[in-house]
Swiss-Prot record:
GO terms for cellular component: cytoplasm; nucleus; proteasome complex; proteasome regulatory particle, base subcomplex. The 26S proteasome is involved in the ATP-dependent degradation of ubiquitinated proteins. The regulatory (or ATPase) complex confers ATP dependency and substrate specificity to the 26S complex. Pfam families: AAA, AAA_lid_3, PRS7_OB. This is 26S proteasome regulatory subunit 7. SMART domains: AAA (SM00382). It comes from Caenorhabditis elegans.
Amino acid sequence: MPDHLGDDMRKTKKDDTKEEEKNFQALDEGDIAVLKRYGQGPYAEQLKTLDADIENCLKKVNELSGVKESDTGLAPPALWDIAADKQAMQQEQPLQVARCTKIITSDKHDPRYLINVKQFAKFVVDLADSVAPTDIEEGMRVGVDRNKYQIHLPLPAKIDPTVTMMQVEEKPDVTYSDVGGCKDQIEKLREVVETPLLHPERYVNLGIEPPKGVLLYGPPGTGKTLCARAVANRTDACFIRVIGSELVQKYVGEGARMVRELFEMARTKKACLIFFDEIDAVGGARFDDGQGGDNEVQRTMLELINQLDGFDPRGNIKVLMATNRPDTLDPALMRPGRLDRKVEFALPDLAGRAHILKIHAKQMSVERDIRYDLLARLCPNSTGAEIRSVCTEAGMFAIRARRKVATEKDFLEAINKVVKGYAKFSATPRYLTHN
């Protein structure tokens, strides 16, 4: 039956389909391997092999230890040795906590130890065979048996769990490159914190002691706490973070006890860095209001002053304090020897504001031709926190317009909203008036 295609047209169409079938070729293994590697970095295969080796090592460790992922975190029942555990419990008797108050030495016999069992009695005892005489000191807590009250175990100092939880275990993810507009301040901090830990011989050769305390002060939102987080990420020393309001306790003497235990725990470390945030909560100038409401806060501050530079040496402990009201701090807390260096975090300049904008815009999906210097000129007397809010609002404008990329117009609208619209909420002029 004739159709709309002629014989010539039908021949040419068949020839085209044959040529297309000839042009299509199946992918071989080499082409598939190239496609799999497309978009990967030069070290992707090495990283994969390292990840596989790490997973295999973890599997071996879990198999040897008998611990598998479970809700209870216990080993499987097939690996339990209940008979050996019962025998160990029968051989090892429970110990009682006591305190060694005095060591009595004599030439005729071995030293004796005077222990005080709380709310019970005092005994003169000797050591068990498993304890060396050099492990026991006066004033330390020990574990004694209930029969002969022999000392079987030296115990660490008793520290409040709230103080132990102040220690930062995981390092923050903030580095010095994430802090903009604070180049001079970072250098001053590194001279106090990093140089004495990495190059102590420089100070020994000069015969001086490195500064041990730094006060960070400036308007709210200028990067004081952010710099402290960057210091915690950089140093390998133990980092303890304390908020000033945590030292204000209900009962008399609790705040001073927490400060003592805090420095006792810091002295047990090889090197320690303590950061007091919002120190004006406990470090205010002393005055008498006639009612005695601030007496407990003042006692806490006096204990802090004593620990910073009192009769006992501080040791290898660096102290950072941050506040936005330095005019309210007590002069005894501010003197050199306790806080040797005062670092002011002022408002960022034009280059600092542009750097802060680039830091926050680096994590965003933005256009490439944004003029950050122009945006920085439109944000006079703005802090780093306000500039970060500008970047967040620019992203909100892009989301509202259903776009995946923020434009320069979004940043301009965000500046009008944050810098100019929220000017009445800014505390920077009030801070500059007080200080």
